[in-house]
């Protein structure tokens, strides 16, 4: 009896993760369409701008601090980096910038975006009620989504920062 109860509990918990992934899939689909169509209104509804901006700024600052010590230009960069990172966070969080990320996933301008069932199967639980998108099933998270006020929003970007370009 105890083993059966543990098995049911394990299935229930794994089911929650599955439901979470498929719940997020509709919003991830809407985000992908907004990126493809450069639809700022829908993009903004599916992006946690403050969280994403903070995360991008943090990564930019970390990259700046990796500069060679004793380098005068590096010291100036470190001094100015919070201001530059703040501006970059504003400039980089927009649909046309994330088009390179969509291209990386194989969603070019002429590629049909898969339905929510396909997207849900590609998402994986990321802990703390978040889900993430990976390039391969066993690969690292590239995009992280968090549910806020009933909508799953892009809240983290773990990809190569060079993918976020303002000019094409």
Q: PLM features: residue spans?
A:
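Post-signal peptide N-terminal segment of mature Sec-exported envelope proteins
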Residues: 24-45
